[in-house]
Amino acid sequence: MKTILVLNDHSTTASHAAIFALDLAQKIRANIIVASIMLSDDVIRHEDLKLGETGSLLIHRSELLKTLFAQKKRYADFRPVIQEIELTDFTGDELHQLTNDRNIYLVVRGMDEFLPSALISINLSISMLLSNIKCPLLVVPSSWNFKAFRELVYLTDLRFCGINTVSYIADLAGEWNARVIIAHSTASGLPEIEEKDAEDIFKNEVHNHINYKNLSMRMVDKAMVPDVIKLVVHSFHADLLVFVNQHFHFNTFTKQYFKDKCALYEPVPMLIFPY
């Protein structure tokens, strides 16, 4: 059984992301752990969720948990099991151990993309989170309206396209029969590759190893690189952007994501792999 971990800092963005995570969990038949930072003393110890001798994870009765329990009554068939625990913060050893011990499939975090400090805040937060987890991080923007995924776009240089990453994306996309597009954008400092060579790499190194029919490749014109996020959202119709936390692409893309306070396009969720 897959498990989705939702990070709860008690903000409206966290609640927004958690409700989406619940719908996602129902779709893929996963359970949910809500990891909350809490000051309340109204907690119950749950021995099955112990981190170790230094202390136990704790179950809470937060407003978010009450909301999720109410929301899941909508489902006619599968209803995710929801647990809530306490972490000291989202950057320490507790998070690392939790994602490993519970074999977490996905970590979900909300964000307010319109804050003036959004770029600095999200980059710092993502950097710290990705250094402590071994599974993908799904970042859900506050302005995004829930809908089924139809186009999942993985921005990468084909020469660094990870099979495990594509396999994960294809598995997720299959729940909606969505398209997976590998958008090739040459990494800074590397020579451009011809479209035919890119197609050969895609066919031999990617497509032939992934059992998913709705998988394709598109080239990103070099002239469009400064606005590649706008391109893939508008022209490729991406409703989920996929990145790998690699310096030659990730920083460039996240800077574009927050360009002009996201006024250039409708912000969509980001699925970020830690390696």
Task: Locate each region found by the language model.
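Structural beta-alpha unit
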Residues: K73-V107, I210-L241, Q246-F258, V268, ...
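Intrinsically disordered or low-complexity boundary/linker segments at protein termini
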Residues: M1-H16, Y105, M111-D112, S117-A118, ...
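Short secondary-structure boundary segments
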Residues: S36, M111, H184, V244-Q246, ...
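A short acidic, glycine-rich active-site loop
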Residues: G52-L64
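Small/aliphatic-rich secondary-structure junction motif
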Residues: M1-G52, E151-R218, A238, Y265, ...
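Generic structural signal for helix capping and beta-alpha/helix-loop junctions
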Residues: D41-D42, G92, P116, K147, ...
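Short glycine-rich anion-binding loops that position phosphate/pyrophosphate groups of nucleotides
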Residues: I44, D112-F114, Q246-F248
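Charged helix-capping and loop-helix junction motifs
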Residues: S121-S125, D197-I201, T254-K261
